[in-house]
Amino acid sequence: MGKICKSPTVADLSSFGSVAGDTDCKNWQFLSAPARSNSPDFTHAVQHKAVAKLFIYKTQVNKNRTVSDTKRSFYTIHTRPINSIYRRVVEELMVEMHLLSVNVDFQYDPIYALGVVTAFDRFMLGYAPEKDRISIFNGLCKALGDEPDRYKQDAQRLESLAMRLSGTDLVAWLERSTSFADTQDLQASLGAIASNPQFKYSRLFAIGLFSLLEKADLDLVKDQETRTAALKQVCAALNLPFDKVSKDLDLYRSNLEKMAQARIVLEDAIQAERKKREKRETQASASPSGEVTDSTN
């Protein structure tokens, strides 16, 4: 029975993430004594039932979670304070990811993962110390019951693909008019998105698309005309709302600029405070004998 029970937890269940760490067979009540059967058909049926039950359980758990639950989990995982302007970034991203995770139509996909990683990296640029930045990202994912490595690996895979393609080739790949042997699973995901009328579009998904285009051809996204043309092609192929995608990306770029300006202001304030501190330390270490000499002149 142990062998049958563990089989789906490694491969079949990987796309659903962990369920409160419950991969122990003793908690899968539906696997009764007959599951000890060595019949291949029976084993296959049990595995599929395990996948279905675990997916339903995870969905129910996530659906019942509140924003407060997610925040509480996050601050239990990441216990250090978050610096000034970055705190709002973290909490807004956390809320956005939470609301998606509890939406019945939402499904994780690699482009969404790239959007999450890209948004985090861009908005958290300059955060110190680096180990805290890593801890914050890990906390965001784990607070939602997901694995940060899955996000990072999927994002890195898509980035590597985009960097070896031209902008034109990438758009063709996203349209599924061009394919590559090592990306069949990714294109299957694109096909599922395009054919799903209930696909839950998100700003983070749009950021993932933008990041792909950016990695393939930076000049393409810098020019408004070529950027718009490419986005229209991709949106048409994936049945995405172009106007919504365009507005979300305009806001994304605008917010990146504002964040860059805020970092400059923050750095100026830090430098000013450092100079004041150094001045006070210099005055405090002034020679007492020098003060006496000045008073006698």
Residue spans of the language-model regions?
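Short loop/beta submotifs within extracellular cysteine-rich repeat domains
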Residues: F123-Y127, L213-V221
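Short, solvent-exposed interaction modules
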Residues: Q156-R203, F210-E214
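Intrinsic low-complexity, disordered N-terminal segments enriched in polar/charged/small residues
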Residues: A20-D24
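Short amphipathic alpha-helical segments and their helix-coil junctions
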Residues: S37, Y86-N103, T178-S195
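N-terminal domain-start signal
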Residues: V46-D154, G208, A229, C235-V245, ...
